[in-house]
UniProtKB/Swiss-Prot annotation:
Belongs to the universal ribosomal protein uL14 family. It comes from Listeria monocytogenes serovar 1/2a (strain ATCC BAA-679 / EGD-e). SMART domains: Ribosomal_L14. Keywords: Ribonucleoprotein, Ribosomal protein, RNA-binding, rRNA-binding. NCBIfam families: rplN_bact (TIGR01067). This is Large ribosomal subunit protein uL14.
Amino acid sequence: MIQQESRMKVADNSGAREVLTIKVLGGSGRKTANIGDVVVCTVKQATPGGVVKKGEVVKAVIVRTKSGARRQDGSYIKFDENACVIIRDDKSPRGTRIFGPVARELRENNFMKIVSLAPEVL
């Protein structure tokens, strides 16, 4: 689960390396976000020459969490790190590549472009 002030790695080539969560979107007073949820973040580390610069405020969708997510069949999916993909307002990614596996829950939340770019969907 991701909450305010949580740091995540960025799993795309938009230029950002690490982001800090400012706000969890989707409801008044919502505290935590899980896989497939959209959060507002600020870029804490960035690569030189990237599309996204350090200090920029961006929207991101969570693609991997350490705490994991419960599936409909009762199974759980957990990852080794917390990671996100920076998106535009129309849910399309700002980068052109996705690094690492992403969860199947993104397909249910209509992030089809991210699912198609990902090397593996678990």
